[in-house]
Amino acid sequence: PLTRIKLQLAFIKDKDMSNKLSEDVSEMEKMLNEYLQFASKRSSEKSEKFDISELITNTINKYENKNIIFDSNSKIIFTGRKNLIRRCLNNFIDNSIKYGKNVVLNIKKGLNNLTITIDDDGPGIEEKQYENVFKPFYKIDKSRGDSKSSVGLGMSIASDIIQSHGGNIKLEKSHLNGLRVRISLPF
């Protein structure tokens, strides 16, 4: 169906309208591909033991020239679906970089759980929207200054990943005056 819509767009004489509709179709394709990719990995990936501190370090290393601080010399072995945890971290780090200039990650190992916090100095999110951002296709109000395209699935998928590992995510005001994402996983 999307291919047929794309073909029909070529016949629209109003180029501005055609371009806007084409962007909508591209966004829809991106959304569907993102969800299908998540659903496929979720059903096929097996749990494994891995060093979650190393996973965080490797994830951060792809963000060259970004001010991200993560100081962890301790090896923390976690059992879970590594690629899904990486995807979750990517979603939150991408958002932190998108809205802030400085990002600080921390990891703490408790007796029964593991806590990962991601803080940024961006504009944050209003407390009344904390629960809504985890709903599929939810987009934060345009007044937040988001000029970049978003499908509205990243936070929902990240939440599903953490919940599938028996954990939870909480949003809070960051000490950097932006947003803090607190991920808690059973250990």
What are these regions (language model features)?
Residues D120:
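Acidic ATP/Mg2+-coordinating residue in the GHKL
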Residues M17-N65:
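Conserved DHp (HisKA) dimerization/phosphotransfer helix of two-component histidine kinases, i.e.
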Residues G166-G167:
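Conserved glycine-rich
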